[in-house]
Amino acid sequence: MKKFKDFKVLLVYPNFPMASVLLPAGVSIISAILKKEGFQCRLFDTTLYKPKGESQEEFRKKLHQLKTSSNMEEKVSTKNSDPHDDFKNLLNLYKPDVVGLSLLSDTFEMGIEYAKIARSKNIPVFAGGIYPTFAPDEVIANKYIDFICMGEGEYAILNFCKALANDESTDNIKNFWIKKKDGTIIKNDLGPLVNVNELPYPDYSIFEPERFYRPMQGKVLRILPMELHRGCPYTCAYCEDPSQNLLYKSRGIAKTYHRSKSPKRVIDELHYLIDKYGANYIYFNAETFFAMPNKDFIELADVYSKEIRLPFWLQTRPETITEERIRLLKKMNVSNINVGIEHGNEKYRKEYLKRAMSNQLIIDALKILDNANLPVTVNNIMGFPDETRELIFDTINLNRSIKSATINAYLYNPYPGTALYEVCRKKGYLPKEGDEKAIDTHLSTEAFPYFKTILNLPTISKSELCGLQKTFVLYSKLPRNEFKRIKIAEQHDEEGDEMFDLLSKKYKDVIQGKVQLPYEIKEYLGASH
């Protein structure tokens, strides 16, 4: 038995090197809860290690999906050491009693490398996060994983650590699956959902100071995330949130996974983040900002505009955008809005993605943001099941019909637990044993999850998908008389790269106002601009 103050927890956050991602709230809240109960807690985060080749930021700049920013190097220095060696050294120095991994499907294999190192030193390993929640059998089957935590893990992990510290059985801890020495698995059910208004404030002190910085609209800012709510009331087929709703509803635990923090809790937490960590920019961490009750938004807007006033970024859906809401956001000091378009074909978007909105609605919503002079980043995804080149050009044409400051174009990868994953599985599009999982034909660096695809589609090749992603912004912004040359730029060879570089110079003239932007509103859908 150990006193809690002598029990050491080491959390591991496997991440792609120098990926421009925000601080994860999950491990931060877990650390806060453990420390509040007296446990020691540290974090090993792989984000700041030097990538093999370009960083994700450099790669996105090349594809014109990220504005050229002030030098990140001035704020963030990369680590040139080997992360596995550093992890071994930390284990020897810190001597943790347990190691916990935070896993996504994209980072599972990376995380297992660290689990293997920990188990070689006889340190028990548990894994939590979205991947163990929706692929629990695969994760617990790995020989380097001893326990998994499904669903919300904050207090489940606390109870688990208490049991370990007290030399008590972990067999009956809610949310946990336990692998016994004989290989049998104890599968406990989920516990109740947490009250998001009663959670402690996140402990971001476990992260290195450089992790607070992120490029945003051409600047490098000290950005901190603010969790507004958990889950989402919408039912997008590619997203895990609807599966979270089903996970808890099917067990009779809750009617929905989606819960919002109160405006008072949000404001109090924002004051804490500013005072404790010196935030000068806020990212409202929510799948859909306006999923909160409208009365809560009105209250939040009023207090934020009086007490906080920091610039902020949010993401939302087109159908939630109204002139009145945007007026209040501007009063709050909104800096950038991220809007999910995802696909430009109405029929496909409704049938496959379960996003029932018209292209005209999207155009009208983006027009409201344009009239308000707000920079907009639009998200697009391609490589969905049964997608064709023609369908992808529907998405490109929709992007040509709206005004945006930045365009993101991601390649779809199916996540276990989602409705669209099941479509891919039933149609045989998932890689089989021994198949090459992904192709990185236009990557000169370590593969990032949104710039590769694992699907084997009969309707379009991986190489063509990568070429369309490479040129998506050029197709969306340059005049149509350049389409023949852009098609050459899709190629993954010397000729294609030379043409891409040539057209990229022309694109820079476009964004500098030297060439007229192709907002083909009258041509496309008969809209006006």
Language model regions located:
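A short, glycine/small-residue-rich beta-strand->loop->alpha-helix junction that serves as a flexible
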Residues: 16-25, 103-108
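Charged, glycine/proline-rich intrinsically disordered loops and linkers
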Residues: 50-82, 245-258, 441-446
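Conserved C-terminal portion of the radical SAM core fold
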Residues: 36, 50, 98, 126, ...
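Radical SAM [4Fe-4S] cluster-binding motif and immediate context
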Residues: 197, 202-377, 397, 513
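Short hydrophobic segments within beta-strands
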Residues: 12-14, 44, 102, 128, ...
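Conserved alpha-helical elements of sugar-nucleotide-dependent glycosyltransferases
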Residues: 22-29, 110, 265, 296
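Radical SAM enzyme core and accessory elements
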Residues: 1-14, 19-20, 29, 35-36, ...
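Glycine-rich beta-alpha loop elements in corrinoid/cobalamin-binding modules
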Residues: 7, 30-34, 40-49, 75-192, ...
